[in-house]
C-alpha cells in the first residue's frame, strides 16, 4: 500500500486517502479469508437462494394484508445479472418480490418507488415490477416494506 501511495499514477488518477483506505481494507479481508462475509457484493453473490427467498417472504409479511392485495404482491423465483467485472453476462438465481396489477399500476409504482426516500429500483417484466431481494440487506427489509406501503397509498 505504501508503494501505491507513492506511485505517480496515484496523483494522476487523483486517488484520495479514503479510496486507498477502502482498497486496503478490502485486500486485508481477502488476505484474512473474510471477504465473503465482509465485502457486501461478494456476500450478496454467494448468499444461498433459500436465504434470499426467506428475506423476500419477510418483506411480504411486513406488508399489511390490504396493501399486499392492492399491490398484487407475491414472491417469485427469478434471475439476476451479475453485470460487471469478470462476470458481465452471468445469470444468478434469485427471489424477487413482484408487484403491480396492470401495466399502468406497475409504471406508477415504479415511479413512486424510484422517487421515494430512499429510492427503490426494480425492473419491469411482463407488466410487473420485480424487486430482487438478493440486493436487499436484512436491515433494509423494513425500509422496503415501508416504501411499498407509501407507494401503494399514492393515487
Set out the residue ranges of the language-model regions.
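Active-site C-terminal subdomain of aminotransferase-like
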Residues: 1-64
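Catalytic-site microenvironment of enzymes
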Residues: 150-155
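Basic, glycine-rich
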Residues: 144-149
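Conserved C-terminal alpha-helix-loop-beta "cap" of PLP-dependent enzymes
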Residues: 53-139, 143
Amino acid at each position: 500500500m505504501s508503494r501505491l501511495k507513492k506511485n505517480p499514477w496515484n496523483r494522476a488518477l487523483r486517488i484520495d486517502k479514503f479510496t486507498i483506505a477502502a482498497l486496503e481494507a478490502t485486500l486485508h479481508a481477502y488476505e484474512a479469508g473474510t471477504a465473503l462475509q465482509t465485502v457486501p457484493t461478494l456476500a450478496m453473490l454467494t448468499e444461498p437462494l433459500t436465504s434470499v427467498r426467506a428475506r423476500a417472504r419477510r418483506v411480504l409479511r411486513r406488508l399489511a394484508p390490504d396493501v399486499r392485495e392492492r399491490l398484487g404482491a407475491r414472491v417469485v423465483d427469478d434471475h439476476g445479472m451479475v453485470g460487471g467485472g469478470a462476470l458481465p453476462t452471468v445469470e444468478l438465481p434469485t427471489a424477487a418480490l413482484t408487484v403491480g396489477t396492470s401495466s399502468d399500476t406497475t409504471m406508477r409504482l415504479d415511479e413512486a418507488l424510484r422517487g421515494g426516500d430512499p429510492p427503490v429500483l426494480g425492473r419491469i417484466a411482463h407488466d410487473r415490477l420485480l424487486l430482487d431481494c438478493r440486493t436487499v440487506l436484512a436491515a433494509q427489509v423494513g425500509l422496503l416494506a415501508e416504501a411499498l406501503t407509501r407507494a401503494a397509498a399514492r393515487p
